[in-house]
């Protein structure tokens, strides 16, 4: 696909992590992980890639490798709050497009970043954009750690859930009603796994943390449900391939080190 129209990549990076302390600074092939993320993101069509950090050590590590970084407050409740502050610090206009790339995604595909940014340039009615891909196993469909998304006819998110959605009434009870090759389902149906990358209009991103939390958001522990609850539209890019693995645990880190030669 062609390059997206202008946008900024923001990479939230938080030093505290219960499962992997100092995660943004974890060494991978001689570079901090967050620098790998920024370098991958810079291969997209973004005008600039900026790390929004909660600790001066992250800022220093980024600057040592030529990566732009901002020091944000350490007490933000979520990554969205951190990004909202970054928008203010950068002086982004309300209609400017921002793509949130997680700081633990050193294998992020730059083409996916472009695609998610392009959603908002193409869809003036959407406040957010994100991505999904087809689930290919019954285990993933049933796994609550695999977030599912159902789309409407316009490619907008209808709902996100940790539950296996949609549920097929006529296939009986249980979470494993679907499996690859399942018969008796509508033509073209495939359950979709949500990919945790987002694009926003900067004005909406600044307002988002002030929106009251949604009951569905609190039940599912999925922040994007707040946007749907308050009537905002989320456009979804369906990609044909699964994203590169993120880094949440020491085992994940070792796997990525092997892939990147570290």
Curated annotation (Swiss-Prot):
Q: Does the keyword Hydrolase apply?
A: no
Entry's localization field: Cytoplasm
Cite the Gene3D superfamilies for this sequence: Spore Coat Polysaccharide Biosynthesis Protein SpsA, Chain A (3.90.550.10)
**Key words, A-Z:** Cytoplasm, Lipopolysaccharide biosynthesis, Nucleotidyltransferase, Transferase
Q: Which GO terms describe its cellular component?
A: cytosol
Give the enzyme's EC designation. Answer: 2.7.7.38
Instruction: Write one Pfam family the protein is assigned to.
Output: CTP_transf_3
Q: What would you give as a GO molecular function for this chain, any one?
A: 3-deoxy-manno-octulosonate cytidylyltransferase activity
Pathway, per Swiss-Prot/TrEMBL?
A: Nucleotide-sugar biosynthesis; CMP-3-deoxy-D-manno-octulosonate biosynthesis; CMP-3-deoxy-D-manno-octulosonate from 3-deoxy-D-manno-octulosonate and CTP: step 1/1; Bacterial outer membrane biogenesis; lipopolysaccharide biosynthesis
The family line of this record is:
Belongs to the KdsB family.
Annotated protein name in UniProt: 3-deoxy-manno-octulosonate cytidylyltransferase
Q: Name the species this protein comes from.
A: Acidovorax ebreus (strain TPSY)
Organism lineage string: Bacteria, Pseudomonadati, Pseudomonadota, Betaproteobacteria, Burkholderiales
Quick one: which gene encodes this? kdsB
